[in-house]
From Swiss-Prot:
The gene is sfsA. Disulfide bonds: none annotated. One of its GO terms (molecular function) is DNA binding. Transmembrane segments: none annotated. The lineage of its organism: Bacteria, Pseudomonadati, Thermodesulfobacteriota, Desulfovibrionia, Desulfovibrionales. It comes from the Bacteria. This is Sugar fermentation stimulation protein homolog. Pfam families: SfsA, SfsA_N. It comes from Maridesulfovibrio salexigens (strain ATCC 14822 / DSM 2638 / NCIMB 8403 / VKM B-1763). InterPro entries: SfsA (IPR005224), SfsA_C (IPR040452), SfsA_N (IPR041465). Belongs to the SfsA family.
Length: 239
């Protein structure tokens, strides 16, 4: 098993999911008390939030925050599924620095939240020699598996479609570009766009591949200690 590159903070624990009642808040039962738990996942988390199931939560690192817990993972089938959407961005950098991202071989530095035009992309790789073209990467968290295929998105995503257009524009200018899909569950055998949820995104995704955008879909290795990076998933043959 891959060693974690991201470690959960001390004090993490399991709780029982009750409901999601706001976009960024879920209720859980912890030690007989109902507590509010922050979630940064704005997706639907389709099929993952079931009353009575176990979830994995971490204590807020800011003692002044109103919600004292953060949702890290859910366990609808007993196995951990990571739902914290800040993880892929962190993993991109840490996997690169650990030499576990072969697609970025030859590059020597990464800048996160790199500005491009009026927008920002999650990662910009450069090399000291200047011989390699810029490599722009946008990260996405994947929590949905359907018919053995890890799928993105789990809800309509105008922002995701915008990122695809931006990446295609950069590819047309001669830069290298990629999408890093971090699949925070282990029951998918391949990756593909969720055309049954956002057909426009799926259409743009394949156009992006034709335009030179690369797809890096990696499976997470999850434990209650933290998160590592596992195998690379092939693209589903369902185009």
């Amino acid at each position: 098993m891959s060693e974690p590159l991201i470690f959960y903070p001390q004090g993490c624990c399991r709780a029982i999911f009750i409901r999601r009642y706001k976009r960024f808040t879920v209720e859980a039962m912890l030690d007989g008390e109902v507590v509010g738990v922050h979630t940064n996942n704005t997706g639907s988390m389709l099929g993952l939030l079931r009353e009575g199931q176990e979830i994995y939560i971490s204590p807020a690192q800011n003692p002044n925050r109103k919600l004292k817990w953060t949702l890290e993972a859910v366990m609808p089938f007993g196995e951990m599924i990571g739902v914290n959407t800040s993880v892929p961005n962190k993993m991109l950098q840490l996997a690169f620095e650990a030499g576990q991202l072969p697609e970025a071989g030859g590059y020597t530095a990464i800048k996160r939240e790199a500005k491009v035009g009026n927008s920002r992309l999650d990662g910009l790789f450069t090399d000291d020699s200047g011989k390699l073209p810029k490599l722009w990467v946008e990260c996405k968290n994947v929590t949905l598996v359907e018919d053995d295929i890890a799928c993105f998105p789990d809800a309509q995503t105008e922002r995701g479609r915008k990122h695809l257009v931006e990446l295609m524009d950069l590819a047309a200018k001669g830069d290298r570009v990629a999408l890093f899909f971090f699949v925070q569950r282990t029951d998918g055998s391949c990756f593909g766009p969720a055309d049954f949820i956002d057909p426009e995104y799926a259409e743009l995704f394949y156009k992006a591949l034709d335009a030179g955008v690369k797809c890096w879909a990696y499976e997470a290795v999850l434990s209650e200690r933290g998160i590592g990076i596992g195998r690379k998933l092939p693209l589903a043959a369902c185009r």
